[in-house]
Amino acid sequence: MNKKIQTISLNRKARFNYEISDTYEAGIVLTGQEIKAIRKGQVSLAESFVRPENGELWLYNTHIANYQSGANTNFGEQLDPTRKRKLLLHKQDILKLKSKVMEKGLTIMALKIYIKGHIAKAEIGLAKGKKNYDKRRTIMERDLKRETRNWEKRKK
């Protein structure tokens, strides 16, 4: 049974600044206000990262705006928009990620937040920082692809 996937937020800088080796799908523990804000697209992954703590994975610095509605939910309580949120993965995946993060230069980045069916999910990836010359090479390759695509259009 295929569930409809609706992408809400992408972390484009992560794919440019880091080399992503493995990706995982993780559930996110959210409050009612937060899931409503995510469905409206009020989420930013710009500075977000994942850190293992006590055998669990936690998502840091993901900005989910407070949901504004006619009636205040949670009795008017305003949540911290950048609070840490627990990620739900299989134990074996958590242990695998934790052991790889202990290696030099590896980190876990949040790449995407999306809705699968009716559930909010996060795509996280094991990443290693790129050097400046790798970034320049990526830019050159992107420009070359764009130029060849435009050249082919003009040719037709």
Please place each PLM-identified region on the residue numbering.
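Ribosome-associated RNA-binding proteins
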Residues: 1-156
